[in-house]
């Protein structure tokens, strides 16, 4: 193994362990409320990045459903709230509608499969901040996943016309 591979692997392991260490300390960060009946409180802990302003977090809330060949989606809005007295953001997905799908005829013999169907709507892209957890309150039957987006180093220039 090359020196870079060893360092990259060690760095990833350290970031993962750091994230796990943070994961047990939500109550130490701030008094986020417990989830109400019918909801779960799901938490995302982010590793520290060198230039966090170049990153965004896409929150992927959804359900694993049995679907055919059509494109499926759920509907909803992720609302940002503030933890009173602290000013820390948290997010609430109040209700989820659907599923909705395209209505194309599937080719004969196409099997149904179980896939993660995301909620599509407003508010699902949030600022990257490794100093605070991303706390999401979602209905019990909704799973929360996330994806990290990063800005390209290449910056284009607009042309006056």
Swiss-Prot record:
Whether Ligase counts among this entry's keywords is: no
What subcellular compartments does it reside in? Periplasm
From which residue to which does the signal peptide run?
1-23
Source organism, top-level taxon: Bacteria
Which keywords, in A-to-Z order, does the entry hold?
Answer: Disulfide bond, Periplasm, Protease inhibitor, Serine protease inhibitor, Signal
Q: Name one GO molecular function term.
A: serine-type endopeptidase inhibitor activity
Question: SUPFAM superfamilies from the xrefs?
Answer: Ecotin, trypsin inhibitor (SSF49772)
Cystine pairings recorded for this chain: 69-106
Q: Where is this site: Reactive bond?
A: 103-104
Name the InterPro entries for this protein: Ecotin_C, Ecotin_sf, Prot_inh_ecotin, Prot_inh_ecotin_gammaproteobac
Q: Name one GO cellular component term.
A: periplasmic space
Q: Which family does it belong to?
A: Belongs to the protease inhibitor I11 (ecotin) family.
Complex formation: Homodimer.
Q: What function does the entry list?
A: General inhibitor of family S1 serine proteases.
PANTHER family in UniProt: ECOTIN (PTHR35890:SF3), PTHR35890
The protein's name in its UniProt record: Ecotin
